[in-house]
């Protein structure tokens, strides 16, 4: 019998285009370690929330065309991280599949719900109070999340329920995402060799 809990769930993805060159290494059963170097400091800060609060080991290195703007780097990092999750999850046997979490950060409160369904879908409502956080264009978060869900093959609901500070709004989202992903990616010891779907596949 296959013991899923003892299987290494580790992936490494390299994605090279004319716009970005990215390498991602992911361990789903880590301790929140890793080095992030996307070239966009605020994106590093947000992915660090996934790493630390999800207890995923994540290494990302990206060389992107930042002389143009951050768009390609942010979107492509989402794509490549999504590919790494899909690869590390493998056949999805034993997964809890669903995860949800509410995360506060001072006045901000966000809810994230994850379904590792195999069906990409992003449903996102973040009423940002300003257009930029420092130099970072908040519109790019939808590009990151869309790339992530499309390639991780998951359904993702993101709702910022309260918030006045845009930094707090998005950081609470990433913290909630981290915990929801952690829950969804965990192995259910009572169902180690089954798929959490009546179809028998995800």
Curated annotation (Swiss-Prot):
Keywords recorded for this protein, A-Z: Amino-acid biosynthesis, Cytoplasm, Histidine biosynthesis, Lyase
User: Could you tell me the superkingdom of the organism this chain comes from?
Assistant: Bacteria
Record-linked InterPro entries: IGPD_sf, ImidazoleglycerolP_deHydtase, ImidazoleglycerP_deHydtase_CS, Ribosomal_Su5_D2-typ_SF
Could you tell me where this protein is found in the cell? Answer: Cytoplasm
Catalytic reactions on record: D-erythro-1-(imidazol-4-yl)glycerol 3-phosphate = 3-(imidazol-4-yl)-2-oxopropyl phosphate + H2O
Please state the pathway this protein functions in, per its UniProt record: Amino-acid biosynthesis; L-histidine biosynthesis; L-histidine from 5-phospho-alpha-D-ribose 1-diphosphate: step 6/9
**Which is an annotated GO molecular function term of this record?**
imidazoleglycerol-phosphate dehydratase activity
Q: Which PROSITE patterns match?
A: IGP_DEHYDRATASE_1, IGP_DEHYDRATASE_2
CDD domains assigned to the protein according to its UniProt record, in alphabetical order = IGPD (cd07914)
Similarity remark: Belongs to the imidazoleglycerol-phosphate dehydratase family.
Q: What is this protein called?
A: Imidazoleglycerol-phosphate dehydratase
The source organism is: Acinetobacter baumannii (strain AYE)
């Amino acid at each position: 019998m296959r013991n899923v809990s003892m299987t290494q769930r580790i992936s490494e993805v390299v994605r090279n285009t004319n716009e970005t060159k990215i390498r991602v290494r992911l361990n789903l059963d880590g301790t929140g370690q890793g080095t992030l170097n996307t070239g966009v400091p605020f994106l590093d800060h947000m992915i660090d929330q996934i790493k630390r609060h999800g207890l995923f080991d994540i290494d990302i290195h990206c060389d992107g065309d930042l002389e143009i703007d951050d768009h390609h780097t942010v979107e492509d990092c989402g794509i490549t991280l999504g590919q790494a999750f899909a690869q590390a999850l493998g056949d999805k046997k034993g997964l809890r599949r669903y995860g949800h979490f509410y995360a506060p950060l001072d006045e901000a409160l966000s809810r994230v719900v994850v379904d590792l369904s195999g069906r990409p879908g992003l449903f996102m409502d973040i009423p940002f109070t300003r257009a930029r956080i420092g130099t970072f264009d908040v519109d790019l978060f939808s590009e990151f999340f869309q790339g992530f869900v499309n390639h991780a093959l998951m359904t993702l609901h993101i709702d910022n329920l309260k918030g006045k500070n845009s930094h707090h709004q998005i950081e609470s989202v990433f913290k909630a995402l981290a915990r929801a992903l952690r829950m969804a990616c965990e192995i259910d010891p009572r169902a180690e060799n089954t798929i959490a779907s009546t179809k028998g596949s995800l």
